[in-house]
From Swiss-Prot:
Amino acids binding 3,4-dihydroxybenzoate: R130
Organism: Burkholderia cepacia
Family classification: Belongs to the intradiol ring-cleavage dioxygenase family.
Entry's cofactor comment: Binds Fe(3+) ion per subunit.
PANTHER family recorded: DIOXYGENASE, PUTATIVE (AFU_ORTHOLOGUE AFUA_2G02910)-RELATED, PROTOCATECHUATE 3,4-DIOXYGENASE ALPHA CHAIN
InterPro entries (alphabetical): Intradiol_dOase_C, Intradiol_dOase_core, Intradiol_RC_Dioxygenase, Protocat_dOase_a
Protein's name according to its UniProt entry: Protocatechuate 3,4-dioxygenase alpha chain
Record keywords: Aromatic hydrocarbons catabolism, Dioxygenase, Iron, Oxidoreductase
Gene: pcaG
Superkingdom classification of source: Bacteria
Length: 197
């Protein structure tokens, strides 16, 4: 019997635009997922999660792709397609940074609730981009959830001086949507904390 070797890894990209986010990039193909997690009729506090991905030299990455997974405002994942259709909440978004003139990701969602009593509201993020051999996992916590963040078991695994790299900053201005700013830094002194999952 022949023993086969594992297929070698290669950098993840630049297939994203055409294969995973075609509508966002203007291709005549339907995207399976969009940057919208919560439709306008979904329950909860509607917010925008906005940010950029920076490489190790501090340059904005124009061709990264990010995926976001979260619960709704009540701490629940959608249970079925019917649940998604009725609630307007998918729990998942995919967005490329090349779809915005400033190379930002902009996700329309609702602020997540708690999944469990000891977990702070958060959004799971997967980052894929050129130059990395596998995707990177991180989380977004919220700066206006200080008490919940202080008790979160996952956030408490991170050294205190690094936790700020996981916390989105709220920007609420009258008459405008609430925005949480969260930048992903792939390397360097302010590198975002990534999880080995």
């Amino acid at each position: 019997m022949t023993t086969l070797k594992q297929t070698p890894s290669q950098t993840v990209g630049p297939y994203f635009a055409y294969g995973l986010c075609p509508q966002q990039y203007g291709y005549d193909l339907k995207s399976l997922f969009t940057p919208t997690i919560a439709a306008p009729h979904a329950d909860g506090e509607h917010v925008l999660l906005v940010g950029q991905v920076f490489d190790g030299d501090g340059n904005v990455v124009s061709d990264a792709m990010l995926e976001f997974t979260q619960v709704d405002g009540a701490g629940r994942f959608p249970a079925s397609r019917d649940d998604v259709a009725k609630s307007g909440f998918t729990g998942f978004a995919r967005v490329g940074t090349g779809t915005d003139a400033q190379h930002r990701f902009v996700v329309e969602t609702v602020k997540p609730g708690r999944i469990a009593a000891d977990e702070a509201p958060h959004i799971n993020v997967t980052v894929m981009m050129r130059g990395i051999l596998t995707h990177a996992f991180t989380r977004v916590y919220f700066d206006d959830e200080a008490a919940a963040n202080a008790a979160d078991p996952v956030l408490n695994l991170v050294p205190a001086e690094r936790r700020a790299t996981l916390v989105a900053k709220r920007d609420a201005q009258p008459g405008r949507p609430v925005v949480y700013r969260f930048d992903v830094r792939m390397q360097g002194p302010d590198e975002t904390v990534f999880f080995d999952v």
